[in-house]
């Protein structure tokens, strides 16, 4: 179909004619019913990117026509903008890309894999509140693409600006630190009349991205049952567990997991956005979990920070954070260096770790803590993302280490209790339903596949509420 629209354009030798003529010819072809091109940028409005107490940058809008504010952060990732922008860890932030050209391979479809997990995104929606690029591709080309970056931003209601000096923006953020900023769309910009700067870290962002109700994923060949605490979990984290044979039950971030821990073989704490100190309920629940259970535990990113707080350590805010796909992290147990994918503005203060914990990884760029491990128990966590998406898979083996400890724990429990009834208790059965081979993926706006029965229609059952 698109070839019909292309035929309305003059031969390549005549493409030197005025852009207005080309646009007029194309619009005429559209009026006849031929499809539009893969870009929504014909007459972009003026847009302004303003850093609080800092410079003002003027460019062109290619997203939603509205004004927003948030924390301005930057990523040096060369590729993976669909994964980055859909990462719940970016909730409340305006993402500045250092890569000069963004959008050249478009935005893929919301296709799901055999377990109902999104193939190309890390959540069902665009999580960043704003997008800043030097140059946006008006034409895209990739076999998975179904729309342009501009069309995605407009559909998701996210403002975006191009044509600004991202080198100057990143230099400012690097020198002054992550700052509050806003994107204003319109020809007339008046700083005095524009909306105030809003600090997203003053609110509990995790509560906005965490699942509202527990759900279950059973790959059909399950060899272990893992409880996942959803603080804004990425799809590829769930996929990394399921593809290794784990059956998982995902709980809201503030669910009292210690109440049902004995029904699981391990606990996993996910990534998420914002200040970890906002999640005091989660910290309390993790502390109680470690007191009453010997379950293997693994945490990633925010999960690493929450586990550290539960252990008694402290967290600190970094000047401008680490957001890239090429950050070196040293494994202190083996001396090996891994190239890692990272997205965080806070870090664990390794000097405050209790005596029964030790650092696991260290950042070779800024010497910040990248992981910790318990000296005697199967508990560890990393600040970086071993599941990547995007980024390298150097450290994906950590999922194997974790699930190996889960298997050993499961076998030890079977040895101690050889006659233990493997059927779930009424409490857990009430939560999960009787038979759930398949997936229910009600994360945010995700819908349940028609072929799979729903796991939980209401947020929490009366039995579960009483137990909590």
Swiss-Prot record:
- Specify the enzyme's EC class, one word: ligase
* Pathway where it operates: Amino-acid biosynthesis; L-arginine biosynthesis; carbamoyl phosphate from bicarbonate: step 1/1
Family that this chain belongs to = Belongs to the CarA family.
Q: Does the keyword Ligase apply?
A: yes
Q: Where is the transit peptide?
A: 1-27
The protein's UniProt keywords, in alphabetical order, are: Amino-acid biosynthesis, Arginine biosynthesis, ATP-binding, Glutamine amidotransferase, Ligase, Mitochondrion, Nucleotide-binding, Transit peptide
Q: Where is the active site?
A: 301 (nucleophile), 385, 387
Query: Which proteins does it associate with, and in what oligomeric form?
Result: Heterodimer composed of 2 chains; the small (or glutamine) chain promotes the hydrolysis of glutamine to ammonia, which is used by the large (or ammonia) chain to synthesize carbamoyl phosphate.
Q: Which GO terms describe its molecular function?
A: ATP binding; carbamoyl-phosphate synthase (glutamine-hydrolyzing) activity; glutaminase activity
| Gene3D superfamilies (UniProt xref) | 3.40.50.880, Carbamoyl-phosphate synthase small subunit, N-terminal domain (3.50.30.20)
> Where does this one sit in the cell?
Mitochondrion matrix
Q: What job does the chain carry out?
A: Small subunit of the arginine-specific carbamoyl phosphate synthase (CPSase). CPSase catalyzes the formation of carbamoyl phosphate from the ammonia moiety of glutamine, carbonate, and phosphate donated by ATP, the first step of the arginine biosynthetic pathway. The small subunit (glutamine amidotransferase) binds and cleaves glutamine to supply the large subunit with the substrate ammonia.
Q: What's a single GO BP term from this record? A: L-arginine biosynthetic process
Q: One GO cellular component from the entry?
A: mitochondrial matrix
* The protein's name in its UniProt record: Carbamoyl phosphate synthase arginine-specific small chain
- Supply the EC number(s): 6.3.5.5
Q: Which PANTHER family does this entry report, sorted A to Z?
A: CARBAMOYL-PHOSPHATE SYNTHASE ARGININE-SPECIFIC SMALL CHAIN, CARBAMOYLTRANSFERASE FAMILY MEMBER
């Amino acid at each position: 179909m698109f070839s019909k629209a292309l035929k309305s354009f003059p031969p390549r030798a005549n493409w030197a004619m005025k852009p207005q003529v080309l646009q007029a010819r194309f619009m005429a072809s559209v009026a006849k019913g031929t499809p539009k091109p893969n870009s929504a940028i014909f007459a972009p409005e003026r847009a302004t990117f303003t850093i609080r107490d800092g410079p003002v940058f003027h460019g062109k809008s290619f997203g939603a026509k509205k004004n927003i504010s948030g924390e301005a952060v930057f990523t040096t990732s060369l590729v993976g903008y669909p994964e980055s922008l859909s990462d719940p860890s970016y909730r409340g932030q305006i993402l500045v890309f250092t890569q000069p050209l963004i959008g050249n391979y478009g935005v893929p479809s919301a296709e799901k894999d055999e377990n109902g997990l999104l193939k190309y995104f890390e959540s069902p929606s665009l999580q960043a509140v704003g997008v800043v690029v030097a140059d946006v591709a008006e034409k895209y080309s990739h076999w998975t693409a179904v729309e342009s970056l501009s069309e995605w931003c407009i559909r998701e209601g996210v403002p975006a600006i191009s044509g600004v000096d991202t080198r100057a923006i990143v230099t400012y953020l690097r020198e002054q630190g992550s700052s509050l900023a806003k994107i204003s769309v319109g020809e007339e910009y008046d700083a005095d009349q524009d909306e105030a700067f809003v600090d997203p870290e003053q609110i509990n962002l995790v509560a906005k991205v965490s699942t509202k109700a527990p759900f279950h994923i059973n790959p059909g060949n399950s060899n272990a049952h893992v409880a996942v605490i959803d603080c804004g979990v990425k799809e590829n984290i769930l996929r990394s567990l399921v593809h290794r044979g784990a059956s998982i039950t995902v709980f809201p971030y503030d669910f009292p997991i210690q109440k049902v821990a004995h029904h699981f073989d391990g606990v996993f704490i996910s990534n998420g956005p914002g200040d970890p100190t906002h999640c005091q309920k989660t910290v309390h629940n993790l502390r109680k979990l470690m007191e009453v259970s010997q379950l293997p535990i693994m945490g990633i990113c925010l999960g690493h920070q929450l586990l550290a707080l539960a252990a008694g350590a402290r967290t600190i805010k970094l000047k401008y954070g680490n957001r890239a796909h090429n950050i070196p992290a040293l494994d202190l147990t083996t001396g090996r260096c891994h190239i890692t994918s990272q997205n965080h503005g806070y870090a664990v203060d390794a000097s405050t770790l209790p005596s029964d914990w030790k650092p696991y990884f260290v950042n070779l760029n800024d010497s910040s803590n990248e992981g910790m491990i318990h000296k005697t128990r199967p508990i560890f966590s990393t600040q970086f993302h071993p599941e990547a998406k995007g980024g390298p898979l150097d450290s994906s083996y950590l999922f194997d280490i974790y699930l190996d400890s889960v298997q050993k724990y499961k076998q030890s429990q079977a040895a101690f209790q050889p006659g233990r009834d493997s059927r779930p208790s009424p409490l857990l059965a009430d939560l999960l339903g009787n038979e759930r081979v398949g997936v229910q993926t009600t994360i945010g706006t995700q819908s349940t596949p028609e072929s799979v029965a729903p796991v939980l229609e209401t947020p929490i059952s009366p039995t579960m509420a009483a137990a909590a």
